[in-house]
């Protein structure tokens, strides 16, 4: 299948998942959506997740009538892998498709923030695919029940970013143009290190504060020189950068672990490859996405590997933020990735 046709199929599948999840959000009580269904793959699975997973398997089973692929996603068992068509020989698989059917479950199930459907596609490699293999990425907003506009963004490698906005009231779509911030300072802008959950927030906040002080100095009494927005969705964080709302973001939770524990660890809830599978979209928009040491972001396409990442709205600002982040990490005795 030509990549353009595959893109159209993915856009259709995303729309079906989005509409099914929104319908369930309209019909289900908050407490029911937030019921824990299982703990598998790389994260906690809630009742609302099961809705998207059922649609995911159904729709991708239909896609298997046209192409062969390895699907990587939560909800597919402990290894998070299923080959389509069922029983296909690995030698005949064309693509690896990694999906997060609801990125931002916690915010969505309590109707606090939109969630995102994330998909990355790579030509299949028998030895295993990595993030850098992804050549097509799609992200679709799952809106709150009270929200009538929702966005979809996509990118093909070296083809730039494309986006459209859907009006749920009348079904129309309009083209929109993502525009990351071109600011060269973090002063009076949004940006932060992710610290969503109890257990490590003190260290993460200390690194964040140290970095901010390095870049802006001590804030005068009664003033805030920069701001933060802890959006519990990696796709949502990328969206905030893409739309110019945030200037920089980082998720460095794996760096709190000793280096020997940073591979296939299960002791801390971290970002996973399916969470960052659309980073191609950010890079195609000119956003710098990398590791804390400045090297290109990469990870195996699985459901377990912890991922540490930094994203900065433009290269000029990245040249200021990355050295400050590295200095802040060193000050707090946190080792960079190898």
Residue ranges and their predicted role:
Residues 1-102, 315-317, 322-326, 330-338:
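N-terminal subdomain of lithium-sensitive/metallo-dependent phosphomonoesterases centered on the IMPase/IPPase/PAP
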Residues 2, 103-105, 197-199:
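A generic structural motif
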Residues 7, 43-51, 109-112, 232-235, ...:
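Short, conserved micro-motifs enriched in small and acidic residues
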Residues 10, 14-17, 21-24, 140-338:
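An extended, acidic
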Residues 40-45, 103-107, 226-228, 267-269:
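A short glycine/serine-rich beta->alpha loop
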Residues 50-55, 62-74, 117, 235-253:
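Conserved long hydrophobic alpha-helices within structured protein cores
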Residues 65-72, 126-135, 162-163:
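Short secondary-structure capping/junction motifs at helix and strand boundaries
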Residues 90-158:
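DPxDG-like acidic metal-binding loop motif
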């Amino acid at each position: 299948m030509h990549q353009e046709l595959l893109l159209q199929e993915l856009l259709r599948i995303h729309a079906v998942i989005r509409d099914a999840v929104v319908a369930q959000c309209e019909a289900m009580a908050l407490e029911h959506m937030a019921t824990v269904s299982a703990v598998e793959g790389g994260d906690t699975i809630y009742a609302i997740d099961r809705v998207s997973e059922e649609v995911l398997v159904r729709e991708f089973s239909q896609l298997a009538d046209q192409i062969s692929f390895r699907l990587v996603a939560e909800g597919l068992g402990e290894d998070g892998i299923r080959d389509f068509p069922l029983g296909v020989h690995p030698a005949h698989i064309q693509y690896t498709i990694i999906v997060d059917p609801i990125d931002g479950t916690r915010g969505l199930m309590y109707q606090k923030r939109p969630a995102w459907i994330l998909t990355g596609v790579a030509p299949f490699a028998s030895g295993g695919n990595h993030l850098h293999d992804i050549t097509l990425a799609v992200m679709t907003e799952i809106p709150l029940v009270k929200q009538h506009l929702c966005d979809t963004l996509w990118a093909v490698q070296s083809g730039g970013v494309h986006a459209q906005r859907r009006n749920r009231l009348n079904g129309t779509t309009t083209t929109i143009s993502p525009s990351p911030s071109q600011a060269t300072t973090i002063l009076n802008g949004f940006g932060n290190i992710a610290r969503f959950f109890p257990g490590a927030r003190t260290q993460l906040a200390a690194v964040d504060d140290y970095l901010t002080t390095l870049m802006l100095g001590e804030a005068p009494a009664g003033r805030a020189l920069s701001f933060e927005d802890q959006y519990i969705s990696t796709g949502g964080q990328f969206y905030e950068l893409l739309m110019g709302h945030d200037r920089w973001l980082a998720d460095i939770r794996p760096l709190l672990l000793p280096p020997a524990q940073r591979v296939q660890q299960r002791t801390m809830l971290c970002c996973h490859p399916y969470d960052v599978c659309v980073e191609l979209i950010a890079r195609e928009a000119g956003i710098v996405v990398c590791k804390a040491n400045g090297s290109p972001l990469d990870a195996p396409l699985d459901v377990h590997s912890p991922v540490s990442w930094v994203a900065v709205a433009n290269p000029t600002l990245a040249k200021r933020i990355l050295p400050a982040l590295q200095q802040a990490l060193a000050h707090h005795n946190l080792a960079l990735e190898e």
